[in-house]
Regions:
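Alpha-helical transmembrane segments and their juxtamembrane interfaces
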Residues: 12-14, 90, 252
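Extracellular glycoside hydrolase catalytic/binding regions
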Residues: 24-30, 54, 59, 77, ...
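Aromatic-lined substrate-binding rim segments of carbohydrate-active enzymes
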Residues: 63-137, 176-178, 258-269
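Bacterial Sec-dependent N-terminal signal peptides
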Residues: 1-22
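N-terminal carbohydrate-binding accessory modules
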Residues: 21-78, 93
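Acidic active-site catalytic centers that drive phospho-/nucleotidyl reactions
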Residues: 39, 120, 242
Length: 320
């Protein structure tokens, strides 16, 4: 009798782990219905995961094994590959081939790990010509994979919404010529704070478009949640493609209460969220210490407090 109970328990755990290991296989092609991100069965889905730091500053973490570890140990069901456009000697502008090699290592790692991946054009400025070329290439190469999400402009800083809108429409047009279905994320002015601007004048003529809001909990208070709530009420689909628990500078102490307030809010709204970042810079938002192996297998002592906390969140909420 005991052996039967043990076998049943073992079988249940095995099935659960197999289902967990096949996240994209289970949920498939994502789309937007109203303001909600949904899976292939039109069921609401919440993506939760981590963003890599700028590829041009922390390229050592841009590999398939690191992605696999984030899925296995952190329970990420999505990762974000943040391709630095101007910053660093190996930015996309200065070294496009190196940049694509690093970004594609994360993309391919996510596909192998059966999780979703955001291809993030990580810039604060308009680089239309370069962006069109890059997204044309990526959308031709990866259109057949439902894992793919495109983020066409990380954080516009001083551009107006009219400028961001015009830029985004051109990039969307390029992507949609090759990839008619996968989700596209569009940024908004003031480092993705002014989510009310696209709510007043959204992009039209395309489907499966979402708009990004970014927060750093120790800086951005309830006012930003209220602003986002109003945008959603107006019909705007929102995706939190970057966030964390410290100040907007990326440094300073973690504000655990403010962070939890944001987590509770996102969970109540079924908003997908990404935390910044997989890097080892000497600042609070970098989740890793210098001791961290480039390919994952990080021990507790390799994680900073932000890494320990976000892993706790991901393990708790990504139970599937």
């Amino acid at each position: 009798m005991k052996s039967k109970i043990w076998f049943a328990a073992f079988s249940f755990l095995l099935i659960a782990n197999v289902c967990k290991a096949q996240f994209v296989k289970k949920h498939g092609q994502l789309s937007v219905q109203g303001t909600q991100l949904v899976d292939k069965n039109s069921n609401p889905i919440v993506l939760r995961g981590l963003s890599f730091g700028w590829h041009s500053l922390w390229p050592r973490f841009y590999n398939e094994k690191a992605v696999s570890w984030l899925k296995k140990d952190f329970n990420c069901n999505v990762v974000r590959a943040a391709m630095g456009i101007e910053l660093g000697d190996h930015s996309y502008i200065k070294d496009p081939e190196f940049s694509k090699q690093k970004i594609e290592a994360v993309i391919n790692g996510a596909i192998k790990s059966d999780i979703y991946v955001i291809i993030d054009w990580h810039s604060h400025n308009v680089n239309l010509k370069e962006a069109k070329k890059f997204f044309d290439e990526m959308s031709k190469k990866y259109a057949k994979y439902p894992n793919i999400i495109y983020e066409v402009f990380n954080e516009p800083d001083y551009e107006t919404w009219q400028e961001v809108n015009a830029y985004s429409e051109e990039i969307i047009r390029v992507i949609r010529e090759n990839d008619p279905k996968n989700i596209i994320l569009v940024g908004c002015p003031h480092w993705d704070q002014d989510i009310d601007r696209p709510a007043e004048d959204p992009i039209t003529g395309y489907t499966n478009i979402m708009y990004t809001m970014h927060f750093y909990a120790a800086t951005h208070g309830k006012y930003l949640r209220d602003r986002t709530d109003e945008a959603i009420k107006s019909g705007l689909p929102v995706f939190i493609s970057e966030s964390a628990g410290m100040e907007a500078s990326g440094d300073g102490p973690l504000d655990y209460k403010a962070w939890q307030d944001y987590i509770d809010w996102m969970e109540s709204k079924k908003l997908s969220w990404i935390t910044w970042s997989v890097s080892d810079k000497d600042e609070t938002c970098s989740i890793l210490k210098k001791s961290a192996n480039s390919e994952g297998k990080w021990k507790e002592e390799d994680l900073k407090d932000s890494g320990i906390k976000v892993r706790e969140y991901l393990r708790k909420y990504n139970k599937e």
